[in-house]
Structures are given as C-alpha cells and as structure tokens.
C-alpha cells in the first residue's frame, strides 16, 4: 500500500489547538447551566436574573465571531487565536475574584470575546490544509470537532455540578486557566504563520465599524427589552428597530460590510443553513439552561445531581455523532435529530415536581440524538455551501446565528421562568420549541437537494 507523505496528509499537529480552541465556548456555556442557581444564592438575587451571565457571553460572541472571522480571513489565524485564548484565562481570573454580580457579567462578556477565535480558526485551517494537500475531504476533522463540541456541551453540566459540589461556583471558571494555557502553547507551536499582504493601517478599510456599532446597539437594546419587557422601556425596542433598518441600508452600500447581505441574498442554501443554525440553537440552549434550571428549582435536585441527570444526553449524543458522521446525508441527520427534539418537547408538557427520575433521564437521553446530529449536519452544510474565500467569515456568521439563538433562548427563559411557576414555564418553553422544530423540518425539506451530501 502506498504511504501518504506529510505533504499529502492533513497536519495532525493542528488537531489539539483546533479542538481546544473550539471547545472553549461550549465548556463555558454548559458548565454555567448548573451554576446559575448557586450564583443567584451567593449574590442574593432572583435566579432568573442570572440569565444575564448567559446573554452577556452570547452578546459578545454574536458580535465577535464575524469580526474575528473576517480578521482571520485577512491576517491568518495564529495571532488572533493566541490573543483570544489568553483573554479567556485573564477574564476567568476576574470572574473568580470579582466581588459583584455585574463584575461577573463583565468577565463573562470578556470570556465570550476570547472564545470567538477557536471555530473560525479551525475552519480556516481546514481550508488551508485542503489547498496545501490538494485534497478537499474534511469530513473526518469536521466530525472530530463536532464530537468534541457535543461531548463538552453535554458532559459540561455533569462536570460543572461536581466541581460546584466540591469547590463552589468559582471552580467552573478555574477550569479555563489550564485550557487557556494549553491552547496558547499548542497554537504557538503548531499554527502556521500565514503571510498576508494586508497591513494594520488598512484595517479601517477592511472592518465595517459603523455596521458593527449598529448591529451591537440592535442586539443590546432588544436583549434588554425582551428580558425585562415593560412599557416604560419600549423605547429600547424602537431604537433597536431603527438601528436594524439603518444597518441593512449601510451593509448593502458598504464595500466591506460587517455582514455581507448581498452575498447572503444570492446564496439561498447558505441562508437556510444560518436560519436552521439559529433555530437549532434556540432548542439546544433551552434544554441546556431551561431544563437544568427546572431540575434544580422545579424538581429540587442539587447542582451535582442535575448535572449527572444530563449524562445520558452526552452518551447518546457522542454515539449518534460517531455512528452517522460520515454515513448519513445531511438532510437525514436534520430530519432524525429534529424529530427526536420534538419528542423531547412533547415530553416536557407532562413533567412535574413529582415526575419519576427515570422519565427525566429518558428525556435527556432522547435529546442526545438532536444534540449529536443537528449541529454536525449544519456544520457540514456550511462547509459545502460557503464560498471558500470567505470560509472564516462564513463560519463566524454561522456561530453568530447560533449565539443569537442562545440569546433568544435565554430571553425566553428569563420571561417564562419568573415567579413561582417554573413548571408552567418549562411547559411553555417546550411548546415554543415544538413550533421551532416544525419550522426546521420545513426548512430542511425546502433545501433537501443541497443537503444530499454527507
């Protein structure tokens, strides 16, 4: 059998920094799920207010992902990856030692910025290695990235619960420090130095600062309004709507837009993938934060026990990702995953404070199927549909869509879980997610021809 030379094969030394960088976001998302109640108790605030810790990270990432993705397309991934992973470690130290809740919110925002480079860097390097080797078959590394992300996303609550049980809520931030150091070291050693003709003094020509500002104002004002909806702050909704309209006009006229609406307008399949990614995220994060909070507050479990209850979801998710990674078509993954998500949401309609634990474990296990399939399917679709010259920005926009979905989810949870009726809240959250699941199936059917690949 002919030996494959190093020039023909994907550089496997890139695997550790690519995987470590990509898991920084899911580990900071998933472990927090079981920490919200302990943090609320520690700072003496209502538990629904801790959703700001969720929203602040996703506000940062929804803005930072496309910006850093574009910077990576221009300057290469190495410097940005090293800076971003260092920021995660520094921000985690702030989180551990801050005396105030809003200091913790700020730390989460900085952590969000720090996690923005991992995924666009990985997608850039996959494309870079494809050009270097002359091969364009990234299914193996894409599956590895998806499995590692799914593994962390689902095992995170279990690890977080055990850490909180032994060392308090601060311990979930302590984990970031060795991860940050390892990511920096591996990135420094193995990420290639990509020559770029661009100079820093041309940055203002490459980055749409006006578009970024308008996008930020829109997200921030709407997030504040919908998390605490009240007639007295309705003006925030109007400001957000106005900024959104101006944003669309500016982006259509800009030579280097923050979000290239013209490209999106001519790539219906990619648009469909972005919308599916957003809707998938609403369901996934509703389970991650809503279901776990209900297990603690509505079912009376400890953080450690609530985390352990999510372990079956991890096992099923990893199994499904490995089983179907290179076997099933993208559309079949989407259909199967969404149907299982709908079954879970139907189950949510019947859970109460005295529901047997085995039923709650079963619901978590069933949701492992969409957890293992949906993000993998959308990730594969993105790689095949995005222009190769814009893979970094396209990957960043995909993550932005997911993080906007997370913001929508956290806003829903904050609204529905207020007061003493958290069980009613989980029922209503399930109904909302059922409607979203139906929309995902419709979108998949509409784009079925472009989703026939693996």
What are the roles of these predicted feature ranges?
Residues 73-204:
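Helix-loop-helix hairpins in multi-pass membrane proteins, especially solute transporters
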Residues 95, 187, 222-223, 247-251, ...:
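Structural signal for membrane-spanning alpha-helices in multi-pass inner-membrane proteins
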Residues 59-63, 93, 150-154, 158, ...:
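Hydrophobic/small/kink-forming positions within alpha-helical transmembrane segments
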Residues 1-8:
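Short, Lys/Arg-rich, polar N-terminal cytosolic tail immediately upstream
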Residues 35-64, 103:
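Extracellular/periplasmic helix-loop-helix junction of adjacent transmembrane segments
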Residues 143, 165-276, 283:
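Hydrophobic transmembrane-helix bundles of small-molecule transporters
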Residues 10-27, 32-36, 47, 53-56, ...:
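12-transmembrane solute porter fold
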